[in-house]
């Protein structure tokens, strides 16, 4: 919604009522879901008996997760980029660069090539790497590069596209 408003008008929407709602949600997620090591939890409140039933292939994981999976964590990047783009408020740039991106780097798998983000922080072992998760992050890096002109963000987007293109196949259904 904020992106549409900003795109249509060509201006920031700092005073739009949805901005304060989005800002409040962002603050609450950062405050309620944060972990000591700069990540976010998968759920709030943390339930020690939680069963994760939405894993690939119908697998189920029992017990407490130490952090969120990549997909919900990367949504924080999308939100911060969108809020920065919509408002121009450097608060979102600071949150992104000081909290979200450092946490996101804990998912970076540089051991398996081409490098990309894996589905769970690397310090907890090897986990799945998914093209769809990485494409959303690559798009966010492209948007953020466009806003900041910082070459590191473009380089990260290109690295992610190298991973994504590595999965290309001309086989039907492949």
Residue ranges and their predicted role:
Residues 10-124, 151-173:
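Low-complexity, Ser/Thr/Pro/Gly-enriched N-terminal "stalk/linker" regions
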Residues 128-141, 156, 160:
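Mobile, glycine-rich extracellular loop/lid and propeptide segments
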